[in-house]
């Protein structure tokens, strides 16, 4: 056999087998493709295959296909209904005509009844047509619901209604929450809201600053009162104890400086209690003092004041006052020694406001009084006799002090220091 002929026959056989296998494979592919389209679309009405030996899938427009499918579905029930309805209508018409004829035969002499029957017939006909239309509408709606896969039972419809109501409620709540969020965001970004926030912050800061300033003012007021009382007491005692540089008073100066240092420490501890005690004593004097007692209440308050000061001073720092106990009891008429007065001449103190110091002829008379019934401080007044009177006019041989006017005795008690 010729080898060329053999090769041609073998090649044609192989081509036939290859064509068969390819066609078979394409058929399997078409079946798989149609199965996928059926699963997705639910119908193969929109799919068409075009081409010769190798077909190609083509999809028709979806809107047209859907409308045509719906029209077919709707037209078929109508045709069925209309196909059944003519026979029924004809039968009903025949029955109605027979009934009318029977009535006319039974009562031919009553033409009014015939008129009434004739008028009732069109009304019945209209009602029959309306009922037929309603039945057709309901049948069409049922068919559409069946095509769409909707349930027809009452329970399923109620469940669907509840489900739709819950979805609508959820949507409404979501819309309301979104609106509230946007409104809040807008108000926070607006300048008016920032101004109100700054205003509230400023008011809160003013309240806190006012409260702190009130506390600081009260504290500074208390410190100032205590400091003034300390300063007045220290200045008065320094004025009493500071002598002039005289050869006879060198030894007493050291004692007075040591005593003044000790008293400063003690007065700082007792200063907080001293103004209250003086005020209470002044109030008691205000109540008990009569018009005829003179300077007796002031004398008692001066003694009580000295006792309070001595009690507050420790024993090792107590200042030995040059004034004796006898001089304290005999406050209005204390003796005066002229030599000692010359030794204890004092300079006026700048810090002691109520102290008035005057120097005349070496006679030094110290009056320790209360500055007022509301003031809890000591008033040191240095008095001098007029020039027309001799220095010893108002004093005895034992050194008694010069007597003041009765008004002076009523207003102050005099404490004479030697």
Swiss-Prot record:
Residues 6-35 form the IQ domain. InterPro entries: IQCC. Residues 129-142, 249-259, 390-404 have a biased composition (Polar residues). Keywords: Coiled coil. Residues 101-142, 230-264, 280-299, 327-355, 376-418 are annotated as: Disordered. Disulfide bonds: none annotated. It comes from the Eukaryota. Residues 141-176 form a coiled coil. PANTHER family: IQ DOMAIN-CONTAINING PROTEIN C. This is IQ domain-containing protein C. It comes from Mus musculus. The gene is Iqcc.
């Amino acid at each position: 056999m010729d080898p060329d002929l053999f090769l041609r026959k073998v090649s044609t056989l192989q081509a036939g087998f290859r064509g068969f296998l390819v066609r078979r494979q394409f058929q399997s592919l078409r079946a798989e493709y149609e199965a996928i389209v059926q699963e997705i679309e639910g119908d193969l009405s929109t799919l068409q295959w075009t081409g010769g030996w190798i077909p190609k899938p083509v999809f028709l427009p979806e809107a047209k296909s859907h409308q045509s499918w719906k029209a077919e579905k709707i037209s078929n029930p109508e045709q069925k209904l209309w196909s059944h309805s003519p026979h029924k209508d004809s039968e009903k018409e025949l029955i109605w005509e027979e009934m009318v004829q029977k009535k006319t035969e039974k009562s031919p002499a009553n033409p009014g009844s015939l008129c009434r029957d004739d008028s009732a017939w069109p009304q019945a006909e209209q009602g029959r047509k309306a009922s037929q239309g309603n039945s057709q509408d309901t049948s069409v709606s049922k068919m559409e619901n069946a095509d769409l896969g909707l349930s027809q039972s009452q329970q399923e419809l109620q469940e669907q209604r509840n489900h739709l109501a819950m979805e609508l409620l959820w949507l409404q709540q979501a819309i309301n929450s979104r609106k509230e969020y946007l409104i809040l965001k807008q108000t926070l970004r607006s300048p008016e809201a920032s101004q109100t926030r700054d205003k509230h912050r400023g008011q809160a800061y003013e309240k806190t600053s006012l409260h702190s300033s009130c506390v600081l003012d009260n504290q500074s007021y208390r410190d100032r009162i205590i400091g003034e009382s300390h300063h007045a007491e220290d200045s008065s005692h320094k004025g009493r104890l500071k002598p002039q540089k005289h050869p006879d008073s060198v030894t007493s100066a050291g004692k007075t400086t040591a005593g003044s240092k000790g008293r400063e420490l003690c007065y700082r501890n007792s200063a907080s209690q001293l103004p209250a005690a003086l005020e209470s004593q002044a109030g008691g004097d205000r109540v008990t003092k009569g018009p005829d007692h003179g300077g007796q209440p002031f004398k008692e308050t001066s003694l009580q004041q000295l006792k309070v000061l001595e009690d507050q001073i420790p024993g090792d720092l107590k200042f030995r006052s040059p004034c004796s106990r006898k001089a304290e009891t005999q406050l209005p008429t204390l003796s005066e020694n002229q030599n000692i007065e010359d030794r204890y001449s004092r300079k006026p103190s700048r810090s002691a406001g109520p102290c008035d110091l005057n120097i005349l002829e070496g006679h030094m008379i110290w009056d320790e009084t209360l500055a007022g019934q509301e003031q809890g401080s000591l008033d040191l007044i240095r008095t001098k006799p007029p020039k027309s009177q001799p220095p010893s006019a108002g004093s005895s041989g034992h050194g008694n002090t010069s007597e003041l006017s009765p008004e002076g005795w009523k207003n102050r008690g005099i404490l004479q220091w030697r």
